[in-house]
From Swiss-Prot:
Keywords: Lyase. GO terms for molecular function: 4-alpha-hydroxytetrahydrobiopterin dehydratase activity. Belongs to the pterin-4-alpha-carbinolamine dehydratase family. This is Putative pterin-4-alpha-carbinolamine dehydratase. GO terms for biological process: tetrahydrobiopterin biosynthetic process. The keyword Membrane does not apply. It comes from Aeromonas salmonicida (strain A449).
Amino acid sequence: MSELASQQCEACRADAPKVSEQELSELMHLIPDWQPLVVKGELQLRREFTFRNFKEALAFTNRLGELAEAEFHHPAILTEWGKVTVSWWTHKIGGLHRNDFIMAARTDQLLSDPLHK
């Protein structure tokens, strides 16, 4: 288990601090397949996962949904034939919190499933 994925998410309040530029740089090294991008003025993490077909993409989406429910932290998910696009950010603060990086790392761990190509 990666260092980041083994960390616990914390309850996030509306006044919680967003990650700093330095924290962003440090944390991105731990999830190198994710891209930071600004969407509607909010910094998010995004990654596209590829699969052999829609059934595998949907199975991954469902596993991710279970993970999100367990942590009470939910991503934006777009499921298509052979592809799932996942975006993490913290709605309450309108940007990135450490929890988003933890959840991105945990999302990566779902790839150990043999359904992923």
